[in-house]
């Protein structure tokens, strides 16, 4: 039997992304976003939800571009800080020692220290209530070469992406692999 929790915001896993954008004056800013994920494969798109009062919201609307930076678990304190203060009054890059790099693909910065970066042009905007969902068309993905496996493919365990546990309000990391996708299910008769 399941206990009814009501309409709470709880899904697992949740990412702990850093979303980066330039404001109208060209100042680079980052914010922490746990509400996001891939939402389309063709064209490749990612969605992030941002409160309208957030500094980054205004920047994405103004520049029509943003990056989604996937931090490693080792960067948890910096990611937490980026979600605690507003870019309106704090230069989060200077405060954390992170490096803003201008994308060559979109009008947005990315965090150089993050092992994986998705560079996005604003594709769609959906007003949901407390949050606006921004859908970004992924124009480029950058990955640190040390996060590639022997075959040259991205390795999630080398990236060691930071995750957010919204139920416990804590950060965590990915566990062990369980088996190959589109293979485990064969035991049921395929």
Feature annotation, model-predicted:
Residues 1-190:
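Basic, polyanion-binding surface patches
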